[in-house]
A protein has these predicted regions:
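Membrane-interface "cap" regions at the ends of multi-pass membrane proteins
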Residues: 1-47, 61, 197-204, 222-232, ...
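C-terminal membrane-solvent junction of multi-pass transporters and transport-like membrane proteins
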Residues: 7, 359-438, 445
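Hydrophobic, small-residue-rich membrane helices and short re-entrant helix-turn-helix hairpins
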Residues: 9, 13-17, 150-163, 212-247, ...
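Extracellular loop-to-transmembrane helix junctions
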Residues: 38-69, 90-95, 241, 246, ...
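Membrane-water interface regions at transmembrane-helix termini and the short interhelical loops
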Residues: 39-43, 69, 85, 93, ...
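Juxtamembrane transmembrane-helix boundary signature
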Residues: 53-86, 95-103, 107-110, 440-447
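Transmembrane alpha-helical segments of multi-pass small-molecule transport proteins
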Residues: 56, 95, 123-150, 164-175, ...
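Hydrophobic alpha-helical segments and their helix-loop junctions in multi-pass secondary transporters
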Residues: 110, 115-118, 164-190, 206-211, ...
Length: 450
């Protein structure tokens, strides 16, 4: 869709609820769901607590479902809608962060996919070296870049097929994990603290799933057939992401009983491979690498939409070239120079999660409080008279800052990250709560629409 258009033309609104479901199902059926499950157990939780954390974390997809429903109702993509909550210029900072999030996720997934293809080559007795790594990067990165040439309808069809193929194969792998899991050890796990264990576990899962995907939700919802019931858009988006995420996290929780290093290792895919019989090695690496492609498709598409929404107006071929270069150059640095990329994965999720949790909380509060009867089209145009919506901006700054002040990790030590906030991701949860509280205050000073 061209940035000259605020609303998606009706001729392009071709997505059905089913296609929406498979789009999000495909994006969340990847092997990384097992790793999230192991990360939950790493917070020293019992089996019941871990399953509760996984369920609530997966239900963070209620946020993308809601955003997608707004996108369908208005026919407008995510960060164009966000202009109403922040103002045309005030929206640029969260918009840039969203673009950065998509680009970083894209780079991480391309790097991961490349390494998985290299591992696949090794399983079929092709020597691992610089050449095979380069071939794998060109192949995987090339697939992602080529997806930028396709229409939304074509991408939706591809996502549907990928859902079936990798969904079935992932279930096979899940069954093998469940058969091998130590169920007695799982049920014997001691209970952890509900505040310092369960809540941070929920926060880190939500940051890496529902909160992150909220930015792309209306980018797909805006293309849904206008005759579709809003509830269908909401539930197909929510369940499409939540169901596979929960099932895979449950598998990861059980897998951690036989592979306790899964949550902390620098090579989680290698650890999972070691837990499987050798005969399924080729299928496993195909599923692990192929399962990342749907995520890359969504990230690549939304990154290009967000770049245009920021105000950087380039032609479609130029946008494709810019993002294609990023997809290739960052992995080249990591794969051939730096040599390490997963060590700061949780830190990456935590930082972006704080910024995005407050953004989506304010976006949804603004929609409920001030846009219940629809958005004023003038507020989301590039020439909008409202340059800065200070209610939304100040709420976001205060909420995000509060989240950082109560967060600590290997590279940041917030001054108030003590007690229950020490060494966990409660800052993500706190930033969303503070954002909602701030918007309630804003509402008392506002009447009607902002």
């Amino acid at each position: 869709m061209q940035d000259d258009f605020i609303k998606v033309p009706n001729s392009e609104k071709t997505l059905t609820p089913g296609k929406l479901f498979y789009n999000w199902f495909a994006a969340n059926i990847g092997i990384m769901g097992f790793v999230f499950g192991a990360m939950i157990v790493n917070y020293h939780l019992s089996f019941t607590q871990s399953m509760i954390a996984a369920l609530i974390g997966a239900l963070s997809f209620l946020a993308p479902g809601w955003v997608a429903m707004i996108g369908q109702r208005e026919g407008i993509t995510t960060f164009k809608l966000s202009r109403a909550a922040y103002g045309i210029y005030g929206n640029k900072i969260p918009n840039v962060i969203a673009w950065l999030n998509m680009v970083c996720w894209l780079a991480v997934n391309v790097i991961t996919g490349t390494l998985l293809l290299v591992s696949l080559f090794n399983v079929i007795h092709v020597e691992k070296n610089t050449v095979t790594k380069a071939i794998a990067l060109i192949f995987f990165g090339g697939l992602v870049i080529c997806s930028g040439l396709l229409t939304e309808n074509t991408l939706a069809k591809i996502q549907t097929w990928l859902s079936y193929i990798f969904g079935i194969l992932t279930i096979v792998i899940l069954i093998l994990f469940l058969v091998k899991a130590d169920w007695h050890a799982a049920f014997a796990l001691p209970s952890g603290n509900w505040i310092t264990g369960v809540l941070p576990a929920i926060s880190i899962v939500a940051a890496g799933s529902g909160i992150s995907w909220s930015m792309a939700a209306a980018d797909w919802g805006a293309y849904v057939n206008p005759q579709t019931r809003p509830a269908a858009t909401f539930w197909n988006t929510t369940l499409g992401g939540a169901v596979p995420m929960f099932v895979l996290m449950a598998g990861g929780i059980l897998l951690s009983t036989i592979e306790p290093s899964l949550a902390t290792t620098g090579d989680p895919f290698g650890v999972m491979y070691a837990a499987l019989p050798s005969w399924i090695g080729v299928i496993y690496f195909l599923v692990a690498a192929g399962g990342l492609i749907p995520q890359c498709i969504i990230s690549f598409r939304s990154a290009r939409i967000n770049l245009a929404t920021i105000g950087i107006h380039v032609s479609q071929p130029t946008s494709l070239l810019i993002h294609g270069a990023i997809v290739i150059l960052i992995p080249i640095y990591v794969l051939f120079i730096s040599g390490n990329f997963l060590s700061n994965f949780e830190i990456f999720l935590n930082f972006l999660g704080i910024c995005l949790a407050s953004w989506v909380a304010i976006f949804l509060c603004d929609s409920i409080m001030f846009r219940r009867h629809g958005y004023n089209i003038q507020l989301v145009k590039q020439d909008s008279p409202v340059h800065y919506n200070f209610g939304g901006i100040l709420s976001w700054i205060l909420a995000t800052t509060t989240g950082f002040l109560f967060t600590n990790n290997a590279i940041w030590n917030g001054p108030f990250a003590h007690g229950i906030f020490r060494n966990n991701s409660l800052g993500v949860f706190l930033s969303a709560v503070v954002a909602i509280f701030c918007m309630l205050i804003v509402k008392t000073f506002k009447r009607g629409r902002i």
